[in-house]
């Protein structure tokens, strides 16, 4: 492309300080360096993780910053050493990477790349420790290696998944984070047998994706647990067959579930990060074969406490990161699930706004309205 090797001027939504509305600014985006890719973002969506770090609730607040990590785009140019991507390729950026060289990437059992594992503190590229974004010569920092709230962004090649060019980017862009995380937690980690009973704790986007995974796997009962009863009707679209609101009961949730299921559920997936819900999700699975999977990220000081007999009685507790999907290897296959109409992505998309109204997406998330809001970069 004519812009290859040159600085591109484009619009980006800059967070100048914590919890203040994003400002659409003209930024300069430097060309990709070795093992980097510059991508034209066409559609992006807002994830709770963006909001969490924008509010500076994360470890080390870094500002000014360009947030965004769920997106779909087209490769504009590639840096030296990039061989498996070319200008024009359709891609999904991913907040975690796959270098294909480290012990984790070479293991069939792990997706936690040593080189490109998520780092929320780092606001620069790993190659040279510099940002590719600037305004008047001053750096604007990156977020989780993606920064998709910009018309153009630069990423390490390991954080870019090449997908089927026929897949509509305005739909599959939501697969680059939360939806795949929930889906994979059920399909790849919990692995519910056909006809089994699955409990889903938390019915936000990730929990609904976990329910969708249970539906695809053929679970016969999918029990949604949430403190917000307003979420129950929507959750039926994702396969939930019944619901428990802990506020409606004067006994522990694990006891309620045991009574509903003749001793416990076969599988549970915890998507809230609330430490009590995590313990409940483990203690509600059936002895002998029950498996609980933790997806939600807990408070840094949280401690998981349960009696060791819960393990000795053959219950299994697992954790998962990004649904155990390797970004570059596996994400194209998740897109194909959508293309084959096995995965219904449209159900997750409840709102759409032009880039100029990106702050509306933040407002919707704060109000708890909808599931995913697509932000259209070109009006």
From Swiss-Prot:
> Cross-referenced Gene3D superfamilies, in alphabetical order?
Medium-chain alcohol dehydrogenases, catalytic domain, NAD(P)-binding Rossmann-like Domain
Record flagged with keyword Nuclease: no
Q: Please give the Pfam families that the UniProt record associates with this protein.
A: ADH_N, ADH_zinc_N
Chain residues that bind Zn(2+) 1: 47, 49, 69, 177
Transmembrane segment boundaries:
none
Annotated GO biological process: formaldehyde catabolic process
In this chain, Zn(2+) 2 is annotated as bound at: 99, 102, 105, 113
Any one GO CC term of the record = cytosol
Q: What is this protein called?
A: Alcohol dehydrogenase 1
Tell me the organism: Oryza sativa subsp. japonica
The UniProt gene name for this protein comes to ADH1
């Amino acid at each position: 492309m004519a812009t290859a090797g040159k600085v591109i001027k484009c619009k980006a939504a800059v967070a100048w300080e914590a919890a203040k509305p994003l400002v659409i600014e003209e930024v300069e985006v430097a060309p990709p360096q070795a093992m980097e890719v510059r991508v034209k973002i066409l559609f992006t969506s807002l994830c709770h993780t963006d909001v969490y770090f924008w509010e500076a609730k994360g470890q080390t607040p870094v500002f000014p910053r360009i947030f965004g990590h769920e997106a779909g785009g087209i490769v504009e140019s590639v840096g030296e050493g990039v061989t498996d991507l070319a200008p024009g390729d359709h891609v999904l950026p991913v907040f975690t990477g796959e270098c294909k060289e480290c012990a984790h990437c070479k293991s069939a059992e792990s997706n936690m790349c040593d080189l490109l594992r998520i780092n929320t503190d780092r606001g620069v590229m790993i190659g040279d420790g510099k940002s590719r974004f600037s305004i008047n010569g001053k750096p604007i920092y990156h977020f989780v290696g993606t920064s998709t709230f910009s018309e153009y962004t630069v990423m390490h090649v390991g954080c870019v998944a090449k997908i089927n060019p026929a897949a509509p980017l305005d739909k599959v862009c939501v697969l680059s984070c939360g939806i795949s995380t929930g889906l994979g937690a059920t399909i790849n980690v919990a692995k519910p047998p056909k006809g089994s009973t699955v409990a889903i704790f938390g019915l936000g986007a990730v929990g609904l994706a976990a329910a969708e995974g249970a539906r695809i796997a053929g679970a016969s009962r999918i029990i949604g647990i949430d403190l917000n009863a307003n979420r129950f009707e929507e959750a039926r679209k994702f396969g939930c067959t019944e619901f428990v609101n802990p506020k409606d009961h004067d006994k522990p949730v694990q006891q309620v579930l045991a009574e509903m299921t003749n001793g416990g559920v076969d599988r549970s997936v915890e998507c809230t990060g609330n430490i009590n819900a995590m313990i409940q999700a483990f203690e509600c699975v059936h002895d002998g074969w029950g498996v609980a999977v933790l997806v939600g990220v807990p408070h840094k000081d949280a401690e998981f406490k349960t009696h060791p007999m819960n393990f000795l009685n053959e219950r299994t507790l697992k954790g998962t990161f990004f649904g155990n999907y390797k970004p570059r290897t596996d994400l194209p296959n998740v897109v194909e699930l959508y293309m084959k109409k096995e995965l219904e992505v449209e159900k997750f998309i409840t709102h759409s706004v032009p880039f100029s109204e990106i702050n509306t997406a933040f407002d919707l998330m704060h109000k708890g309205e909808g599931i995913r809001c697509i932000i259209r970069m070109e009006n």
